[in-house]
Structure formats: structure tokens, C-alpha cells
From Swiss-Prot:
InterPro entries: Cdk-activating_kinase_MAT1_cen (IPR015877), MAT1/Tfb3 (IPR004575), Znf_RING (IPR001841), Znf_RING/FYVE/PHD (IPR013083), Znf_RING_CS (IPR017907). This is RNA polymerase II transcription factor B subunit 3. Disulfide bonds: none annotated. It is found in: Nucleus. It comes from Saccharomyces cerevisiae (strain ATCC 204508 / S288c) (Baker's yeast). Component of the transcription factor IIH (TFIIH) holo but not the TFIIH core complex. Component of a complex consisting of KIN28, CCL1 and TFB3; the KIN28-CCL1 dimer is known as the TFIIK complex.
Length: 321
């Protein structure tokens, strides 16, 4: 049964004309072979007995029922591109670590992957591109499997980290609320206690108030102790620390070679004390009008000299290369 491609109403099956307005539960499926939208009922009816030709006019693709999947995106072109990307990235799954941090080579690799995706998505040299994909998969089977396993491990680690942080934040929120409630109750107790003590003692008012406040300070709540402990746990979060270390390592590796070893230091190795230095020549310059007008400052000169003196200390060329 061949039907014209129906694009006028995205909420209607082009084969049986089932409308989502009359049948809110209608479910549309697509097959990665051609990405033509068909409702689930038509898929069951047409493809239950085995593979059959796509019912769209002009489409000669042979479809199988087990290949149909729920359409996620409204635009089938987006659906198609996402599926192609998933398939290609499952094969071309190298990361920057596989290039020893070489960003140039990694970018070339990503560009090659994007070329493959573009050709498959737009139907350019499909047979040749598919052959290239198969050849690469056969030659790099072990590397692909290793990267898939590493990716699964990273995803599991990420999920564990998310779960851990979510639980800790929830506990922290509950403890903070408990502390707020205790502080409110302590304030009420303080007011009542001050009134009670003043009515039963001849002690100075200020001393009485101070005594009550000291009593409250000594009553350190268990919730506050738990919150402090929780903050220590969050601070020493192994997931957070490992993530920061990886990022710092990558940033350090990305810094290009420099023979100076000092031009990339965030904090200088010296402390500038302008009043201590006495250079007659520089001192004379700060009193001359033309230098004052240009914004000259003696500290700039001293800072440059000290930077040049300290730059390069601790630099071992053989270790830098």
C-alpha cells in the first residue's frame, strides 16, 4: 500500500489518517532506514508478518518492525542527525587523552568526524563513507571497546558524584532549617530567662543579660555540629577533588613551552617595597613634568627589574621540553 507523503499535519498518521485530536494516545514511530512517520497501529498491521516496503510513495526501503523506534524530536531531520551522531560517535570515540593532550591533532580528528556525519546526513558519498566507517571500526576494535568501557566508567562516576552531592545538599538544607528553628527557640528562651532572672535576683541587669547569653552560647546544638561535619565532608569530597585535579592537569598541559618560567606564574616570587629602593636616576624621573604627565610611577620600573631578575629561577630546560 503506497501513500503520498503527508506533511500538512504532523499530528496525523499519513497512512490511516488517525488524528491526535481524536486519538490523544496515538504514538508515532520512525525507522532509521528512511525516517518516515507511521503510527504504531500501522506498524503492527503492515510489518507484523515480516519485512515490507515503506508505504510512502517513492520510498523503496524495506523496513523491519524491530527497527522502528519512538520519535523523540518533532523535526525528523533532527532525529536523523542525532541518530547518525550516536552511531558515528560509538565508533569514532577517541578523547583528547588518546592524543596525549595534543589539541591540534584532536581538533583535526573531530573535523574528520564532523565530515563523516555531514556526508551521511546529507546523502553525499554514502557508500564510500559507510565503508570508511566499517574499515575504521575493524582496524580499531580494541581501542573502541576500551573507550566505550572508559566512557561507561566516567558516566557511572558522574552519576555517583551527582547522587552524593544531592544527598549532602539535602542533609545540609535540613540541618540549616533545624538550626534556624533552634536559634528562634533560643531567642524566645533568652527573653523569658532574662525576665525570670531579673524578677528573682538583685544582680546587675547587664551582668544578668550577659550571663543568659553565655548560657545560650554554651548550648551548642547537635545540628550545628553535624552541619560543621557535613561541610568538612563536602570540602574533602573525593569526587570534587579528583575532578579539580584532572582539570588543573589539563590546563597545565595546555600551556605552551616557555624558556622564562615566570611569565605564567599567577603570584610573583617577590614582594614589591617601593620605599626601600633608592635609585637616584629613577627618583629624579618621578619629579620631572614630562614623566609625571605620562603617568610614570617608580614602582613600575622596580617591578619590571625584579620580574626580570626572578624570571627563569627554577627553570630546567630538559624538564620543560
Amino acid at each position: 500500500m503506497l501513500m503520498d507523503e503527508y506533511e500538512e499535519n504532523k499530528d496525523m498518521c499519513p497512512i490511516c489518517k488517525t488524528d491526535r485530536y481524536l486519538s490523544p494516545d496515538v504514538k508515532f514511530l520512525v525507522n532509521p532506514e528512511c525516517y518516515h512517520r507511521i503510527c504504531e497501529s500501522c506498524v503492527d498491521r503492515i510489518f507484523s508478518l515480516g519485512p515490507a516496503q515503506c508505504p510512502y510513495k517513492g520510498c523503496d526501503k524495506i523496513l523491519r518492525k524491530n527497527k522502528f523506534k519512538t520519535q523523540i524530536f518533532d523535526d525528523v531531520e533532527v532525529e536523523k542527525e542525532v541518530d547518525i551522531r550516536k552511531r558515528v560517535f560509538n565508533v569514532f570515540n577517541k578523547t583528547i587523552d588518546d592524543f596525549n593532550g595534543d589539541l591540534v591533532e584532536y581538533n583535526k580528528y573531530l573535523e574528520e568526524v564532523e565530515d563523516i556525519i555531514y556526508k551521511l546526513d546529507h546523502g553525499i558519498d554514502v557508500a564510500k563513507t559507510e565503508e570508511k566507517l566499517r574499515t575504521y571500526e575493524e582496524l580499531n576494535k580494541q581501542l573502541i571497546m576500551n573507550n566505550l568501557e572508559r566512557s561507561r566508567t566516567e558516566i557511572e562516576s558522574f552519576e555517583q558524584r551527582q547522587k552524593f552531592e544531592k544527598e549532602m545538599k539535602l542533609k545540609k538544607r535540613l540541618l540549616e532549617r533545624q538550626i534556624e528553628e533552634e536559634e528562634r527557640m533560643n531567642k524566645e528562651w533568652t527573653k523569658k530567662e532574662i525576665v525570670n532572672r531579673l524578677s528573682t535576683t538583685t544582680q546587675d541587669i547587664n551582668e544578668t543579660i550577659e550571663g543568659v547569653k553565655n548560657t545560650v552560647k554554651l548550648k551548642k546544638s547537635s545540628a550545628r555540629r553535624k552541619l560543621e561535619e557535613l561541610n568538612r565532608v563536602l570540602k574533602n569530597n573525593p569526587y570534587f577533588n579528583s575532578n579539580v585535579n584532572v582539570q588543573n592537569s589539563r590546563l597545565k598541559d595546555a600551556v605552551p613551552f616557555t624558556p622564562f618560567n615566570g611569565d605564567r606564574e599567577a603570584h610573583p616570587r617577590f614582594t614589591l617595597k617601593g620605599s626601600v629602593y633608592n635609585d637616584p636616576f629613577i627618583k629624579d624621573l618621578e619629579h620631572r613634568k614630562e614623566f609625571i604627565a605620562s603617568g610614570f610611577n617608580t614602582n613600575y620600573a622596580y617591578e619590571r627589574v625584579l620580574t626580570e631578575a626572578f624570571m627563569g629561577l627554577g627553570c630546567v630546560i630538559s624538564e620543560e621540553l
